[in-house]
Structure formats: structure tokens, C-alpha cells
Amino acid sequence: MELLPRRQQEVLQATVHHYVDTIEPVGSKTLVQRFGLQASSATVRSAMGALEQKGLLVQPHPSAGRIPSPRGYRHYVDCLLPKPGAAVHHLEQELTQLSLRWAALDDLLQQLTRRLTDFTGLMSLITLPQPSEQRLHAIRLVPTDERLLVMLVADSSQTHHLNLRLPHGSVHQVAALERWTDDQLHQSGQISWESLPQQLQTCGQALREALHNEEGRFISPSDQSAHVHGVSRLVAQPEFSDSTKVAPLLDLMDCNPAAFIPSGPGHDDWVWIGGEHPHTALSDCSVIQSSYRDGQGGVGQVALVGPMRMAYATARAAVQCVAKHLNHLLS
């Protein structure tokens, strides 16, 4: 990621903080006055223009100030995130007391999701720890003569190979079928064969039968139970006043809440911003997640979900705090 000049870093950070607090576009004069930037309004305005050219700020209306773009939030999270405040330290102390009052894991996770939502104002999810079976991440299809080589790629990057008879006259379907399975896995972590396009039926059904025999090798996100709290907090955010944005979120919550939290290499501690998330229903959201482990090798996830306009430093520290606490309790 490109390293910004110091002035642009200050302006981007101030713009993010202003927008998180006010939900209003901001101009250079307000930034100077509110954040005490040691620069003139003209200098700050020039820096804002440079950030807009780099795609880190956007102007929602011609006469308005500027707000962070998804790329701007990403740069902020990766390079400019401040240390969390004292409130997170108080949360750690509170969790220590809370841990003395739980009898069953479900009860504990329910209390923790409620506390996370109360602390951050965001929707919280905690998945129950699952055995470390691998998840299917991708399928690669290679036609050779009358055979079809199938490479199953797990989220651990390990592979398993199948060799199928290629149905007669279906070789032209292979590339499109691979793209379709990729889309399915990226969106929900599983394949909905009921939505297989008619033009891919011949080759697709052969692949479906082969994968059915391998289903014990991988686990599906839909098998993972999740405790959820604060859905009403999420849909009450101004960003989701449009029902067309809320409906996909609620549908996903009803069908497969664990899909809010992608799994795989490098996702043990991660922030998804907008369209980075593999599920299109979350293209207007940010998801902060951190994994925890129990004493039997099972892995669960702690996550917060909200609009891209969120207090990332506090939210990320809170998620990490709860995950760390669960690691300690369950190890």
C-alpha cells in the first residue's frame, strides 16, 4: 500500500473520525477547526483533493464536502488505526468477572455477544468452536480426452483429486461450470446445486454426484452454529434505510449467519471492508473478525458487523479482547 505524505495521513484520519461521529461530509475549514490541524484551510483542501484523486476520499454531491471511500477506510485500518481507548481495558476487566458466572458454553457466548453489541453498538456474532475439518475453498476442472480431472482445494490450501468420466458432448461446459462453482463458494461457502443453470446440467450433475461421495471430507459453513445479537442495531443504521440493502442481510441471517464470517488462511484476525467480503449481501458493510480455539482443537470466530462507517479501533480491540478471553477460558 502506498505510503501517504504526513499531511494527507492527518487529513484522511481526521475525515474518517469526523464521518464516523457525524455521518456528514466534511470540508477543509471544519477539519482545521475541529481537529486543530496545523495547516491552513487551503493546504488541507489541497490534501483532500489529492486524497480524492487517489480514490481514498469521495464527494457524494457536487456541493458537499468529502467522505471516506472503501479504499480510504482500508488505508485507515491498515496504516492509521489509533490505539483503543481506556474503555477496552475496562471491557477486559468486566469479561474477567463475567467468566466466573457461566455454566455452559452457549450461555457464555450469548452473554458475550450481548456485551459486544452493548459496547460497540454493532451486530455481534460468535460461532461455536468446530472441529478442524477442512472447508472446500475452490474447485478446479481440467478436461483431458474423455476424462475430467477435478481438484478440490481446501481453505488450508491442501488439495484432493478426483478423476471422472466426462459426459459425452459436455466439454464445452467445463469452464463455465468452474466459474459457477467459484461464485457459489465465494458467496456462501457451499454449492447450491438447485440453482445450477440448465446449460450446465450434463457436466454439473456428474460433478455433483462425485462431490456427494466426498462430502465427509469437508464441512459446510451452514453446519456451524452462531450466537447473534444486535440485528436491530445494524438495520437501524442510516446506511440501511434503503430496504433493498437490508433484505439481503436479513435473508442471509435467517439462512446462514455463519456466512457473515469467512474462514480460511489469514482470516484469524481480519477486517473486511465493503466489497472485499466474499458475500455480496455484505457489500455495504464491514466485518471485523478474530478466531479463538478450545482445548480440543476446535475453532470458533468472534465478529462485529456494521456499516463501513464505524469506530474501527474500538471495534477491532473489542473483538480481539473477547477472542483472547475465550482462548484463555477454553484452553
UniProtKB/Swiss-Prot annotation:
GO terms for molecular function: DNA binding. Disulfide bonds: none annotated. It comes from the Bacteria. SUPFAM superfamilies: GAF domain-like, Winged helix' DNA-binding domain. Keywords: Repressor, Stress response, Transcription, Transcription regulation. One of its GO terms (biological process) is negative regulation of DNA-templated transcription. Belongs to the HrcA family. HAMAP family: HrcA (MF_00081). Negative regulator of class I heat shock genes (grpE-dnaK-dnaJ and groELS operons). Prevents heat-shock induction of these operons. This is Heat-inducible transcription repressor HrcA.
